[in-house]
Amino acid sequence: MYRHDQRTVMTLDAGGTNFVFSAIRGNQDIVETICLPAVSDNLNGCLTVLKKGFSAVKRQLENEPVAISFAFPGPADYKNGVIGDLPNFPVFRGGVALGAFLEEEFGIPVYINNDGNLFAYGEALAGILPSINEELKAVGNPKRYKNLLGITLGTGFGAGVVIDNCLLTGDNGCGGDVWICLLYTSPSPRD
């Protein structure tokens, strides 16, 4: 699908422990990965790590990047690039316009999405799902799969759901996540 796209995009997988920076072109990594410790309790420290990581990636590039795209835990206002109220990142409590900050810093568009969603969508469009469907086709089996549940395990626990090749995002960007479950320790007044 994107194998022939020659645009360069800087990437980040933002985990609770590490920030992993890279760049892709034609659906392939094109630079050495840069792994920096995540800073979750100091906003200036976190922003400095983000600038440092993307700047280090940019120095490795032969061509100017056209965008920054990265995966961040949720929930968040991904569409507007605002990260806030994450259990593993108290530094973002109340909301931080991370997308706008990075757009101003690097002068290119910034796209942020949920890490579980991006994992699942990538596997559905260009990963395991097309591979399975190709294997089925090769042996003459007419069955094809278009649905996928992707689970991510790291510092946190995330998930993404793809149904009929469409990503289920929900109202907070975490439609497939099971990031929080309510535990009632006392009976409900209705019981």
Protein language model annotation of sequence segments:
Residues 18, 29-30, 83, 167-168:
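Hydrophobic "anchor" residues
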Residues 174-183:
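A short, polar/charged loop-to-alpha-helix boundary motif
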Residues 184-191:
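Conserved small/polar residues in nucleotide/adenosyl-binding loops
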